Regions:
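A cross-family kinase active-site recognition segment
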Residues: 165-223, 246
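ATP-binding pocket architecture of kinase catalytic cores
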Residues: 95-191
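Active-site activation/catalytic loop segments of kinase-like enzymes and analogous catalytic loops
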Residues: 280-311, 326-343
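ATP/Mg2+ or Mg2+-diphosphate-binding catalytic cores
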Residues: 201, 205, 213-214, 331-369
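Conserved NTP-binding catalytic cores of kinases and kinase-like/nucleotidyltransferase enzymes
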Residues: 49-138, 262-267, 368-369
Length: 369
């Protein structure tokens, strides 16, 4: 049964930690539900406080769907999954004979960047890859609309589920093949609009600025960070990066943005979501961010499945260990700066240290045999 936008008492939102019914919610910087204020505070999780009315936004949703020409619809927040909680800016929408999802963009994400991501998605959809197709505004034909002080987009929903951590381990080869297919088709993509520059390609200046902004952490000693910074400065940005092929990349090719069909052992990718971070970069960025692994056997296997669709060049293979180091810094920065999750920072810092230790083993794993 699909519930209406305004939840009935029996479907009231509850805190995942303490179970209490919520009249005020806390969401993380990506809009994902954390829980009540007390539980978020106890766990040191930073977030935005919203009322239930702001969370459901029934009047705004109704106004937006009218602009997209929908009638007889019902809307609800997506149900929790093993991969993620409901989000403040997503709704599932059912209308006669069709299913959609509705997205409200944050005000800091500009219209030119919405056009950019929608241009990338349209390019891939025209190449018959499984990405959401946006629905045009019924009056203007634009790929998004403005209402209630924000920009909104409506997409035709794709079937599938997100993977659990265990399913992701089994599915990584298939995910690598799909990423390679995306990269093949994006090599000639010239998007309209502008990429969102804060989420653009990292440079050495970005690395320096990020490292200077971090608070001291016991698992991130200066000598570790200094070694990584120097390695990136000389080996990656100095020697390899200028010669690496550049193309439009997805930007956030992680488990939460990939849909699957079938059981764990035979699952296939049925959808790739969330192109907000699409930008011009190296293919290694997507690979290192979403599929990179510090364990040489797993890295070798993932590279092999990717390369069956889009063979990695010799210089891409040579640069893989440094790309993994850069991706590790990005992951730490996200947890340090946006989520303030120091437990996850500790875990990722330990992974970084092991990656530094095993750099040459990773280089051998990436090399063409």
């Amino acid at each position: 049964m699909v519930m209406p936008v305004s939840p009935e008492p029996e479907t009231s939102l509850c805190c995942a930690f303490c179970g209490r019914v919520l009249d005020v919610v806390v969401v993380n910087p990506t809009g994902e539900l954390i829980g009540c204020e007390e539980c978020a505070g106890e766990r040191g999780l930073a977030g935005e406080v919203m009322t239930i009315e702001e969370w459901n936004a029934p009047a705004a949703v109704a106004e937006v769907l009218e602009q997209f020409g929908l009638s007889g619809w019902q809307a609800q927040k997506p149900a929790p999954s093993p991969a993620q909680q409901p989000r403040a800016h997503y709704w599932e929408v059912q209308s006669p004979g069709a299913r959609y999802f509705l997205k409200r963009f944050y005000n800091w994400y500009p219209p030119a960047s919405i056009r950019y991501m929608h241009s990338v998605m349209a390019h891939l959809a025209n190449r018959r890859l499984p990405v959401p197709q946006w629905v045009p505004n019924s009056a203007t034909g634009e790929s998004f609309t403005e209402a209630a002080g924000a920009n909104w987009a409506l997409y035709r929903a794709l079937d599938g589920r997100t993977a659990t951590r265990q399913d992701w381990m089994w599915g990584r080869p298939k995910a690598a093949e799909m990423l390679a297919s995306l990269h093949l088709e994006l090599q000639d993509c010239l998007p309209e609009g502008e990429e969102f520059h804060p989420w653009g390609a990292w440079t050495l200046d970005t690395v320096d600025r990020v490292l200077e902004s971090w608070q001291p952490h016991p698992d991130l000693p200066p000598e570790l960070l200094g070694h990584v910074r120097d390695r990136l400065a000389t080996r990656y940005f100095g020697e390899l990066y200028p010669a690496l092929p550049k193309l439009v990349v997805h930007g956030d090719y992680v488990a939460a943005n990939i849909l699957w069909k079938g059981d764990s052992m035979s699952a296939t990718v049925s959808g790739v979501l969330d192109f907000e971070r699409a930008h011009l970069d190296t293919a290694l960025f997507d690979f290192a961010w979403g599929l990179g692994d510090r364990r040489p056997p797993l890295l070798r296997a993932t590279i092999a499945t990717y390369s069956r669709v889009r063979p990695l060049s010799a210089i891409e293979r040579e640069a893989m260990p440094e790309a993994l180091l850069l991706g590790a810094l990005m992951g730490i920065d996200m947890q340090m700066t946006y989520f303030s999750d120091m437990d996850e920072v500790s875990r990722l810092a330990q992974e970084l240290a092991l990656m530094v230790r095993d750099t040459e083993s990773l280089r051998k794993a990436a090399a063409l045999k």
